[in-house]
Amino acid sequence: MWQLLLPTALLLLVSAGMRAEDLPKAVVFLEPQWYRVLEKDSVTLKCQGAYSPEDNSTRWFHNESLISSQTSSYFIAAARVNNSGEYRCQTSLSTLSDPVQLEVHIGWLLLQAPRWVFKEEESIHLRCHSWKNTLLHKVTYLQNGKGRKYFHQNSDFYIPKATLKDSGSYFCRGLIGSKNVSSETVNITITQDLAVSSISSFFPPGYQVSFCLVMVLLFAVDTGLYFSVKKSVPSSTRDWEDHKFKWSKDPQDK
């Protein structure tokens, strides 16, 4: 870890008695948010991290090789396939960031999303991106080979709340001029909440309904017993008081 620190930061750490493990980790952001892009697209990678007053430089790594750029933003004006790979950054008062993957593809269309794994009820944002933003019309988003959404003019496709049924293979197609073009297929996975999943796996579908009915029945019986006991309590109390009164009138107590 020490060899990854900038020289000035290393001196500051030694003088302050700090350890490299005490430093926060830098974070890399993509702008725009898509990590899959087409050739000729512009991409900006931004590094978020702490800087010392003496050193505001940033170190960038592409596939573990140091990049000459030392600014907080690394700009790729026209992406090429060899720009694909892992990017990391580090500032003078931060440790090396986790890697961010960039994929540069060749083709007319590319289906884009911030990621491909979502939780139930999360929103999904899909974009049918054309090479050099060429005009695209009559766009269809397809799931498992079936049309899911159609737009006369190219538009992004939103799924407000994902369900398990939204899992599957997706691609988009449309017209560039009179040319029919399609994107590659990608897989989207919707994961289930662990608590719901554990209940569903414990009780097979046919037994889940029976389980609910049993729970309702037990609740009804329990409620009936509660009111029955509550109703009998005053009567028992009166009997006890009558018994106590008769006992106090015993001739031996006079």
UniProtKB/Swiss-Prot annotation:
Q: Where is this site: Cleavage?
A: A195, V196
Q: Which UniProt keywords apply?
A: Cell membrane, Disulfide bond, Glycoprotein, IgG-binding protein, Immunity, Immunoglobulin domain, Membrane, Receptor, Repeat, Secreted, Signal, Transmembrane, Transmembrane helix
Membrane topology (Extracellular): 21-206
Annotated compartments: Cell membrane; Secreted
Domain Ig-like C2-type per the UniProt entry, residue ranges:
24-105, 107-189
Bilayer disposition of the protein: Single-pass type I membrane protein
Q: Which GO terms describe its cellular component?
A: external side of plasma membrane; extracellular space; plasma membrane
The protein's site described by Important for receptor turnover is found at D222
Q: Which SMART domains match?
A: IG
Subunit: Forms a heterooligomeric complex with ITAM-containing signaling subunits, either a homodimer of CD247, a homodimer of FCER1G or a heterodimer of CD247 and FCER1G, to form a functional receptor complex. Interacts (via transmembrane domain) with signaling subunits; this interaction is a prerequisite for receptor complex expression on the cell surface and intracellular signal transduction. Binds the Fc region of antigen-complexed IgG with a preference for IgG1 and IgG3 isotypes. Interacts with CD2; this interaction is involved in NK cell activation and cytotoxicity.
Q: What is this protein called?
A: Low affinity immunoglobulin gamma Fc region receptor III-A
